[in-house]
Amino acid sequence: SVGFKAGVKEYKLTYYTPEYKTKDTDILAAFRVTPQPGVPPEEAGAAVAAESSTGTWTTVWTDGLTSLDRYKGRCYHIEPVPGEEDQFIAYVAYPLXLFEEGSVTNMLTSIVGNVFGFKALRALRLEDXRIPTSYIKTFQGPPHGIQVERDKLNKYGRPLLGCTIKPKLGLSAKNYGRAVYECLRGGLDFTKDDENVNSQPFMRWRDRFLFCAEALXKAQAETGEIKGHYLNATAGTCEEMYKRAIFARELGAPIVMHDYLTGGFTANTSLAHYCRDNGLLLHIHRAMHAVIDRQKNHGMHFRVLAKALRMSGGDHIHAGTVVGKLEGERDITLGFVDLLRDDFIEKDRSRGIYFTQDWVSLPGVLPVASGGIHVWHMPALTEIFGDDSVLQFGGGTLGHPWGNAPGAVANRVALEACVQARNEGRDLAAEGNEIIRXASKXSPELAAACEVWKEIRFNFKAVDTL
């Protein structure tokens, strides 16, 4: 009989369409799918496409009230993952009309919403997504971007230097401001609130902002350089977050900070708009990212979170170090670093980039290398990250035996030496240690730092592999 037929049918009949030609306006996603035993990969891929777009588990008569062909997600290609028995990469295309303009929140709710709890799958991971230019154009993106930031700070031709103030919790506002002043006075460009410094009983946010502003003004007057401190505006409500950002602007601070995953994309996008409207730079910390991106077969790869952040807005974002104490495999890290900085990125599976991405001049984001790095890493960091980056040494500045300012001096001298050596055409990878040693002859601060950290190694295998 014609008409409506109730019951359960296989997803692949509707949602697996290998003959589909993707459109320039489609959002494309590459999922790593691990089906339950007995579930064919086509069915698993189709289930992902269905459950993250128009499908549900049974046939419903209201399907007849719309055009599924126009709105459904489609699994258009499946390939086995080399070296893994039961894993497949399923490529899904979503029509643009499924997403609200300018909302990272809505995009993620659709693509990585309910479907990750789906029973027919043992595990599911979103490896990469291709955002069409027409959708990117609905986002403001980073408040300022790399070039505007350099112009604001008047710093060119080298990476920027930062330092997270430690101990991360427990200092009073006055002592905190003192530590900030010493680091900036010694030669750093930025100091940073730790991601969990918000407004706790031992140091309320307003007091911290005031003492940090004093430190900035003093260090700028003495060095003749523009200085910044990432004032963490993250708060329990958006209203409170705005209050902090407004106060930072009133103090004349150049930059504020936000924890974009714990704070949420809605709050982050609001703050990014405020920052562009009011001339504040926005530093983004990725606290909680490893909860989402650490497992190889389930969750979301950081490159997706990085793309989402560039759309939502931020001028700096933490991106691993390749050499320090936290995650990062070199090629994969550089893959998403390029996704953050460049205007156009070619598909390159060896770096984990599944799709060619065109950002249509959306401003870029500076990657921040932070976590367990010290002066001996400087040549490698300069070579790996290049000029458009922020190198952040927390313990690697404050752990200096003579104090914060000498620690900052050591880092600045090491950086300038590496940049000069690179500009002279020397090979930083091969001659790095020699370059640092030569520079330490003329700088007692650097010599002392070299002595302290000469034996430190973090010898663990990288978890983030292809």
Swiss-Prot record:
The modification N6-carboxylysine is found at K192. Its cofactor is Mg(2+). GO terms for molecular function: magnesium ion binding; monooxygenase activity; ribulose-bisphosphate carboxylase activity. Keywords: Calvin cycle, Carbon dioxide fixation, Chloroplast, Disulfide bond, Lyase, Magnesium, Metal-binding, Methylation, Monooxygenase, Oxidoreductase, Photorespiration, Photosynthesis, Plastid. InterPro entries: RuBisCO, RuBisCo_large_chain_AS, RuBisCO_lsu_C, RuBisCO_lsu_C_sf, RuBisCO_lsu_fd_N, RuBisCO_lsu_N_sf, RuBisCO_lsuI. The basic functional RuBisCO is composed of a large chain homodimer in a 'head-to-tail' conformation. In form I RuBisCO this homodimer is arranged in a barrel-like tetramer with the small subunits forming a tetrameric 'cap' on each end of the 'barrel'. This is Ribulose bisphosphate carboxylase large chain. The gene is rbcL.
